[in-house]
Swiss-Prot record:
GO terms for biological process: carbohydrate metabolic process; pentose-phosphate shunt. One of its GO terms (molecular function) is transaldolase activity. InterPro entries: Aldolase_TIM, TAL/FSA, Transaldolase_1, Transaldolase_AS. This is Transaldolase.
Amino acid sequence: MTDKLTSLRQITTVVADTGDIAAMKLYQPQDATTNPSIILNAAQIPEYRKLIDEAIAWAREQSSDHAQQIIDATDKLAVNIGLEILKLIPGRISTEVDARLSYDTVASVTKAKRLIKLYNEAGISNDRILIKLASTWQGIRAAEQLEKEGINCNLTLLFSFAQARACAEAGVFLISPFVGRILDWYKANGDQKEFAPSEDPGVVSVTEIYQYYKKHGYKTVVMGASFRNLGEIIELAGCDRLTIAPSLLKELAESEGPVERKLAYTGEIQAKPAPLTEAEFYWQHNQDPMAVDKLADGIRKFAIDQGKLEKMISDLL
């Protein structure tokens, strides 16, 4: 009998949400996603020590200023880990822009181009890279500009329908709507503590976004992210892509039985509405307390891990 991971691959592109090389080799995903937390964890893996040493040596060659060396080494390490992962996957690596730049369009574009340049200098073309940006208004504007220059983007920390709509209207390549973190919020802030997979608020959110994109003919790829359990993944089978942590990839691989397509759009393509203005975006996003909380929380957490990574690098310089 077929295992659920093999079955899921027939209807959805499976992406690994990790920097763990062993997991890549084992589960052979199409693509991989990283973020500051994943890079921080990966930096603790013994096999990656040489990548850290190389990044530090490179940074010392670029500048004699300690603060600049930290920035350079951190960027280079994220790219070095991405390069190792690219040896193991046929598709794309997602590398994230510093979360502290989430409200600065110009700085986000500059950082994205720097990361792309480092990949290009290592022989990797743009079609194997996705630049991850937080789905703030400023992040979406940065992505809109980058897409026009041939740099594809992955808009992350996406919790509200307004964020999803603005991303599609900006023509971004891919969005990562978070499932598990939405569930976390509702469990923490409401009376209901258990949800059937089909009623899971994160699943409902991604389903709504998927249907809206397909109904209006948007090309933006929907990649569900941040899963807490197998039920969420099974309920989103048919989504364009799903990025899954190794523990859940393992669970899927060890579970027998078919996975049925749950997401599909069979209706006619309808006209696209007029794009959201900045004021409309903020008003609509602000109507969703969960999304407001989780976007801010996600940016803070990624910024904290970015700081920890820089501290680790600083101590080694």
